[in-house]
């Protein structure tokens, strides 16, 4: 497989909320040597059903194999690959930035430009919370780096397809 064949893919996977399902899904990737870029698991609007948002860099051939293998895992209900142009994807980033009385106004100005927010202020630092598309978060981080990034944590992407169509019909 040539490196040019590899691209970023986002899978939305509905699973029954049963013990060990996350381990079984990640184990399938691990056993086959596939790398997960990010994985988010959360409850859906339907009790007992979770949505896994899995981001991977892989070729189309590998993605076909991944989908086939995931479909073999019994508590998996449905798998959809979300196309980038038909998807709303967001992540959460929290950054602790060195900020004292002298440079704090510049840090806050940068945060405001990105519509992020300061969620904690200490004498020598601030904690910034931002949500958005990966590009926006990367751009904010680039702006904050010159001030001094003390700590950084970022969630994986969560994503939904655009428009009225849902992955699964709502339960009544």
Predicted regions mapped to residue ranges:
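Long, contiguous binding/interaction regions
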Residues: 1-50, 55-172
